[in-house]
């Protein structure tokens, strides 16, 4: 599969996860663990798509910080997107274990907003012929 086709496939998959994030936000429903899992999945797929667009291989990992680091090493300015790495535990730990009572409340609106911004940014790259 070409890098561009791979990126398009990953973005479509990320959009499916993000659709659930939006529905859960709109209806204030579902467990935080499920919400966080779909944020993590959307972000992971978007970061891998971004790397594919750049023609770079990406590690097979759920670790968002590792994916952000690969982009940063390539000179990509990540700004506030990098805070989304906080959702890594939702792919591996909180997918099976509930959040503890000591966990701070999740800011779903902020997570959804940052994920939406990341989605828009990656989709922009797919529409631009020069993907440098």
Residue spans for each PLM region:
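Terminal alpha-helical segments
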Residues: 1-132
């Amino acid at each position: 599969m070409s890098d561009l086709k791979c990126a398009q496939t990953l973005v479509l998959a990320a959009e499916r996860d993000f659709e659930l994030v939006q529905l859960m936000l709109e209806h204030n429903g579902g467990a935080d663990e499920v919400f966080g899992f779909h944020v993590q999945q959307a972000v992971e797929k978007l970061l891998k798509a971004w790397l594919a667009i750049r023609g770079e291989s990406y590690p097979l990992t759920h670790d968002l910080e590792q994916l952000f680091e690969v982009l940063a090493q390539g000179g990509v300015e990540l700004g506030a997107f990098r805070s989304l790495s906080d959702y890594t535990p939702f792919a591996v730990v909180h997918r099976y274990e509930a959040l503890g009572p000591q966990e701070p409340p999740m800011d779903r609106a902020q997570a959804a907003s940052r994920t939406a911004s990341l989605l828009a940014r990656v989709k922009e790259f797919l529409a631009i012929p020069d993907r440098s």
